[in-house]
């Protein structure tokens, strides 16, 4: 069974969308706590890494709103395709650039005025980069939802969350 078939094959799209949306929400909610547990358990004497991760994750989640800019609801409800996917993609590209520019600005400000270490600077940028992938993939998930295949979008998103958790556990 190939990946395309695994993502798209279902007997009931509505039920599959509902179930996978619920699974995706649960996995999404587990990302930060599980990664934080891994960080604190890997070196319990040095909790600085956990603090840096917490700040980075909080900043990245705030900036994710800028990267997504609330277009998903608008895009998925555009069933008559008044705007093309290329237009949504282009707008998302601009909002993602703004997101990373804001992240860089935040890190520079923190380095100058708050004495952020280079470690904190780069961890914040890396976590923001991780959220950049989420913001960018959201426009593709919006397209899937627009085409009536929310189940494909949520399966993809759930897989990405699992890879995030696994990669942090490995590193």
Per-region residue spans from a language model:
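N-terminal membrane topogenesis motif
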Residues: 1-31, 80-86, 118-120, 151
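Signature of the first transmembrane helix
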Residues: 9-69, 100, 126, 130, ...
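Helix-loop interface residues and adjacent transmembrane-helix termini in multi-pass membrane transporters
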Residues: 42-47, 82, 146-147
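Membrane-interface alpha-helices at helix entry/exit sites of multi-pass transporters
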Residues: 51-52, 82-92
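Hydrophobic transmembrane helix module of multi-pass membrane transport proteins
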Residues: 64, 69, 92-171
């Amino acid at each position: 069974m190939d990946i395309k078939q695994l993502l798209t094959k279902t007997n009931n799209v509505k039920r599959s969308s509902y179930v996978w949306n619920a699974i995706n929400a649960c996995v999404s909610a587990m990302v930060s706590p599980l990664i934080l547990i891994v960080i604190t358990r890997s070196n319990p004497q040095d909790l600085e890494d956990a603090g840096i991760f917490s700040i980075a994750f909080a900043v990245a989640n705030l900036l994710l709103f800028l990267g997504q800019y609330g277009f998903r609801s608008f895009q998925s409800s555009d069933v008559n395709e008044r705007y093309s996917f290329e237009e949504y993609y282009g707008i998302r590209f601009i909002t993602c650039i703004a997101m990373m520019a804001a992240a860089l600005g935040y890190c520079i400000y923190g380095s100058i005025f708050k004495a952020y270490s280079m470690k904190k600077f780069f961890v914040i940028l890396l976590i923001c980069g991780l959220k950049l992938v989420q913001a960018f993939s959201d426009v593709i998930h919006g397209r899937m939802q627009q085409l009536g295949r929310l189940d494909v979008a949520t399966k993809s998103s759930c897989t990405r969350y699992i890879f995030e958790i696994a990669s942090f556990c490995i590193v």
